[in-house]
Amino acid sequence: AVNSATSGQDLVLKALGIKDCDIINPTISFMTTAVVPLWNNCTSNIVDVDPVTMCLDPEDVKRNLKPNTKAIIAVNQAGVPAPIDEIREFYDGLIIEDCAHSCYTPGAGTKGDVAVWSFQAVKTMPCGDGGMITTNDKELYDKLVPMTWLGITSTYSRVKKDDGLTGKPGYSWDYEVDMLGYKCYMIDLQAAICLEQMKKLDKNLEWRRHIQKRYNEELSDLIQIPPH
């Protein structure tokens, strides 16, 4: 868990040493999708989206691949999953799946090498602000955990058999820092709110669908894209 999806994307790039390269991201997304690569001295190669799904257009991704392309940030737009399977047919590099707007989408977070989620105030499961990184890569996970808290690896159990001063059980004041890290963990208050919001996910989604239906009814005289 991290303090935002933005921090999550940044940490993934730093943990994997992705820098000084080209990173593909879509034209339609929140600005941080394009900004995070710049923080890592990368070029944001912004490619077109499919006019119906509003997700990455695989053909335009293919046209924009370069020898120096080291990552693709594939955004699941408004609950619609990005075409990662299609992109995998011609690209075998790192794909970060941006699940900020797909907390309730079946299969979300399972296609990319790593997924980043958002619990910011306007998302499906808000906790004020916050985010999460998910991956099946154990090596990457082991790097990310201490990176969220200044590279400190000894804070997870502060009460030890030897407190380091008296030789007796007690609170340990020493820190072990094995790597460069950042202060971007999720605080307990955010986590507690998230756990409660999970219980309300169905209700929140039902309300969002009600709002969507109302918009569609009121704007029915305008040109519509096919419903998802």
What are these regions, as identified by a protein language model?
Residues 8-16, 131, 194:
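Buried hydrophobic packing segments
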Residues 94-127, 132, 142, 172-177:
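Conserved active-site segment immediately N-terminal to the catalytic lysine
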Residues 1-7, 11, 164-166:
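Conserved N-terminal alpha-helix of the aminotransferase class I/II PLP-enzyme fold
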Residues 65, 88-94, 127, 132-153:
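Basic phosphate/pyrophosphate-binding loop/patch that engages nucleotide-derived ligands
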Residues 14-99, 103:
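PLP-dependent aminotransferase-like
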Residues 38, 47, 75-78, 102-104, ...:
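Structured catalytic cores of enzymes that bind and process phosphorylated ligands/cofactors
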Residues 59, 71-75, 80, 84, ...:
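PLP-dependent aminotransferase class I/II
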